[in-house]
């Protein structure tokens, strides 16, 4: 992935000391990262790397990765030569096997599909919050979809963020920068009276 094991664990510990949470990212849950933070956000992306319900049940929040600012509208590709034994274990792959993420969820397409999955998350966890991560592109339409799917929170990923899997042309030129995107998102949430969504 984009971050080393040591970096992910250090960020988890630092976030805990700061009183905030940490997110698994699309690559799956590193056990030591989760164990060192009491506010762990578990993310499921289109590749569903390493997904299991027992991992969801160890988390304090869960969200769908519907988009990413650095590579909006695309999937991901971690070349096989970067898939070490540890990455393979976390992602449910074989060492050396490329990690390919499709551009969208093959089995979740409608808001009702996501809502059903979200209900299962809440049922299995005693009601942890379920959210959506979206790229800052079609902000209002994506918020409408997330709200219809029953999101408790929305993560808005603006232009300028980075990831090892993002082409420079997308990372540097596509999407709305985060601060203006937040203003648009807040205005739209107020307009549709989605006060329950953070």
Predicted regions and their residues:
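Glycine-rich phosphate/ribose-binding loops and adjacent secondary-structure elements
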Residues: 105-198
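N-terminal capping/small domains of soluble enzymes
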Residues: 1-102, 113
